[in-house]
Amino acid sequence: MLLGVNIDHIATVRNARGTTYPSPVEAALVAETHGADLITMHLREDRRHIKDADVFAVKNAIRTRLNLEMALTEEMLENALKVMPEDVCIVPEKRQEITTEGGLDVLAQQEKIAEFAKILTDAGIRVSLFIDADDRQIQAARDVGAPVVELHTGAYADAQSHAEQIRQFERIQNGAHFAGDLGLVVNAGHGLTIHNVTPVAQILAIRELNIGHSLIAQALFLGLPEAVRQMKEAMFRARLLP
């Protein structure tokens, strides 16, 4: 199983004081060295954390691959074609939200998503859609030509009871298997921590987890190398469990 380390909140800390540190590039390189299989960055329309220059700098520095999260807008499409990341994950975006609140509604935007997916694919960029684990959305993702889906794990991570967490986990598990049966590559992420990652990492249909906020939070106490190492180890151990 692959670990994508999202470095958005390195930029959040930097921007809080308007300094040049901590460096997203340095964070990306440290994460790579200690187990990250790819680096994920979300260039939001309001540029609240990652800036355009960060994306270019990280793309040019890393040895693994860049997964660029972006909204379904012409501006972001143009940026992606300039940066040429290995992967683009199209996500829903609202300016007033603190973080991404739900999955992309592919059913409501099939024509536009299909257009973007074709342009990116023709440019050699692999397209992923960040969606809820809903069979209709998963089928729509396949129909618009996206080869990859990233299942939104936020409801699982935020569940307020054990029963609700189990319900949300089963939804993710079933969605992952359904997507896999359709021939889609399945990733997952949002809200995952060292404490809740094990069940999700046990789902064999899921190839990759993208994790950011909790890793950066752990890094405040452990250091980024150890935070990445521990997460990677937790994912590895999960795959060994029966």
Swiss-Prot record:
Per the record, the pathway is: Cofactor biosynthesis; pyridoxine 5'-phosphate biosynthesis; pyridoxine 5'-phosphate from D-erythrose 4-phosphate: step 5/5
Localization in the cell: Cytoplasm
- Which chemical reaction does it catalyze? 3-amino-2-oxopropyl phosphate + 1-deoxy-D-xylulose 5-phosphate = pyridoxine 5'-phosphate + phosphate + 2 H2O + H(+)
Among SUPFAM superfamilies, the record links this protein to: Pyridoxine 5'-phosphate synthase
Name the Pfam families on file. PdxJ (PF03740)
EC main class here is transferase
Quote the record's binding site residues for 3-amino-2-oxopropyl phosphate.
Answer: N6, R17, G191, G212, H213
Task: Give the domain of life.
Answer: Bacteria
A GO CC term attached to the entry: cytosol
Positions of the catalytic residues: H42, E69, H190
Gene Ontology BP terms: pyridoxine biosynthetic process
Q: Cytoplasm among the record's keywords?
A: yes
* Site keyed Transition state stabilizer: positions: E150
Q: Where does 1-deoxy-D-xylulose 5-phosphate bind?
A: D8, H9, R44, H49, T99
**What are the entry keywords?**
Cytoplasm, Pyridoxine biosynthesis, Transferase
E.C. number(s) listed in UniProt: 2.6.99.2
Q: Name one GO molecular function term.
A: pyridoxine 5'-phosphate synthase activity
Q: Which Gene3D superfamilies match?
A: Aldolase class I
Task: Reply yes or no: does the keyword Chaperone apply.
Answer: no
InterPro entries attached to this UniProt entry: Aldolase_TIM, PyrdxlP_synth_PdxJ, Pyridoxine-5'_phos_synth
Q: What is its main location?
A: cytoplasm
Q: Which PANTHER family match?
A: PYRIDOXINE 5'-PHOSPHATE SYNTHASE
Protein purpose: Catalyzes the complicated ring closure reaction between the two acyclic compounds 1-deoxy-D-xylulose-5-phosphate (DXP) and 3-amino-2-oxopropyl phosphate (1-amino-acetone-3-phosphate or AAP) to form pyridoxine 5'-phosphate (PNP) and inorganic phosphate.
Q: How does it assemble?
A: Homooctamer; tetramer of dimers.
Can you name this protein?
Pyridoxine 5'-phosphate synthase
- Could you tell me which species this protein originates from? Neisseria gonorrhoeae (strain ATCC 700825 / FA 1090)
